[in-house]
Amino acid sequence: MAKLHEVYKDKVVAELQEKFGFSSVMQVPLIEKITLNMGVGEALADKKILDNAVADLAAISGQKPLITKARKSVAGFKVREGYPIGCKVTLRGERMWDFFERLVSIAIPRIRDFRGVSAKSFDGRGNYSMGVREQIIFPEIDYDKVDRVRGMDITITTSAKSDEEGRALLEAFNFPFKK
């Protein structure tokens, strides 16, 4: 079992239950899933770029990514409906906890000129989204084998009812918000 999952069960639940006055343990927010999305617009010109992005995302997440396709045609971007333009992975359960632990303890501190993540990126329902400009912050990516630096979106979906609850949940895991 991931260390952060045990921390959640042992400390975070009691802490949040006391802070928000929840009558039941089941009311305490938890992380439901983490979604990693990599948009690869350059894949229109070269299919190998998408294959490399899929390989990177598979190495980071530990599971095979789903290739996302364009929903509609956009002439300005030279995109037709059904063209592969990215990839995504939805992590749940133990893989999610393992990834979250690596994200908080290893990957985020490796970001260049890091001063904390924005606390304004909540969606109003307690879910948090952040962007990463370089996939090389993850230890699974071999720097020498990277063909080009790609970014990705990371969305942490929680069962929190408000941004305040979501932020308290992530802060309990020492998520590095800007002060």
Swiss-Prot record:
Subunit structure: Part of the 50S ribosomal subunit; part of the 5S rRNA/L5/L18/L25 subcomplex. Contacts the 5S rRNA and the P site tRNA. Forms a bridge to the 30S subunit in the 70S ribosome.
Gene Ontology BP term (one): translation
Superkingdom to which the source organism belongs: Bacteria
Family matches, as Pfam families: Ribosomal_L5 (PF00281), Ribosomal_L5_C (PF00673)
Similarity-based family: Belongs to the universal ribosomal protein uL5 family.
InterPro entries attached to this UniProt entry: Ribosomal_uL5, Ribosomal_uL5_bac-type, Ribosomal_uL5_C, Ribosomal_uL5_CS, Ribosomal_uL5_dom_sf, Ribosomal_uL5_N
Organism: Pseudoalteromonas translucida (strain TAC 125)
Stated role: This is one of the proteins that bind and probably mediate the attachment of the 5S RNA into the large ribosomal subunit, where it forms part of the central protuberance. In the 70S ribosome it contacts protein S13 of the 30S subunit (bridge B1b), connecting the 2 subunits; this bridge is implicated in subunit movement. Contacts the P site tRNA; the 5S rRNA and some of its associated proteins might help stabilize positioning of ribosome-bound tRNAs.
Residue spans crossing the bilayer: none
PROSITE patterns referenced in this protein's UniProt entry, alphabetically: RIBOSOMAL_L5
Family matches, as HAMAP family: Ribosomal_uL5_B (MF_01333_B)
Entry protein name: Large ribosomal subunit protein uL5
UniProt keywords, alphabetically: Ribonucleoprotein, Ribosomal protein, RNA-binding, rRNA-binding, tRNA-binding
One Gene Ontology term of the molecular function aspect: structural constituent of ribosome
CC per GO annotation: ribonucleoprotein complex; ribosome
